[in-house]
């Protein structure tokens, strides 16, 4: 809803993407108003479940041709479909994102291994130091660990601010990694 209210395509991309394969976004976007200080120079909405559609739209626009450079040149010069899902997400962040941007990432961890998540943290840090802002919907304790991150946890009781080590995702992941045998026994034995 935040992405649509900010003017992004519901399926993802920059504000210039206007394709639609299926109208599945929440009507919540009509009920919120955004307040911003200044206007971002750049922006992108990465929605994990429809990033394939964004990559397809880029390829279609490039195949149709135009008067300028190919769109994929802004994404590392290769079709995002010619890369693994994780490689394409990292390529997007490293090549397309720039300073003074607003980047909305919806479950980027769906495509990324733990090592790639750490690469994303490094790339994000460089962009934050160039006055970019990230709003991330994630289940990843690795991404939540970003220094100074404001974390909000959604539950049946509503939305509340949470400390990193008090998030459900951190607690459950730590419990599993601290004693996988015990957790597996609990989960798998009847």
Question: Where is each model-derived feature located?
Answer:
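Conserved P-loop NTPase mechanochemical-coupling segment
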Residues: 55-83
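Short loop immediately C-terminal to the Walker-B catalytic DE motif
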Residues: 109-110
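GG-anchored amphipathic helix commonly corresponding to the ABC/SMC/Rad50 NBD signature/C-loop
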Residues: 75, 79, 83-105, 115-127
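Short, well-ordered loop/turn elements at secondary-structure boundaries
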Residues: 39-40, 98-99, 131
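Structural recognition of the conserved hydrophobic beta-strand(s) that form the central parallel beta-sheet
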Residues: 103-106, 133-138
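C-terminal lobe/lid and adjacent interdomain/linker elements of RecA-like ASCE P-loop ATPase modules
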Residues: 115-133, 140-190
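ABC ATPase nucleotide-binding domain signature region
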Residues: 1-63
């Amino acid at each position: 809803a935040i992405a649509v209210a900010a003017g992004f395509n519901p399926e993802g991309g920059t504000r210039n993407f206007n394709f639609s394969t299926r109208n599945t976004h929440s009507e919540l976007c009509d009920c919120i108003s955004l307040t911003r200080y200044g206007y971002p120079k750049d922006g992108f909405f990465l929605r994990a479940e429809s990033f394939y559609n964004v990559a397809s739209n880029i390829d279609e626009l490039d195949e149709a041709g135009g008067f300028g450079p190919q769109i994929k040149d802004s994404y590392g010069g290769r079709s995002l479909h010619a890369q693994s899902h994780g490689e394409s997400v990292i390529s997007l962040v490293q090549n397309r994102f720039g300073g003074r941007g607003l980047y909305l990432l919806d479950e980027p961890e769906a495509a990324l291994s733990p090592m790639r998540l750490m690469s994303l943290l490094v790339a994000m840090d460089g962009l934050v130091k160039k006055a970019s802002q990230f709003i991330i919907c994630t289940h990843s304790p690795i991404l939540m660990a970003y220094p100074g991150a404001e974390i909000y946890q959604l539950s049946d009781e509503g939305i509340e601010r949470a400390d990193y080590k008090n998030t459900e995702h951190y607690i459950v992941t730590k419990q599993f990694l601290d004693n996988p045998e015990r957790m597996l026994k609990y989960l798998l034995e009847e």
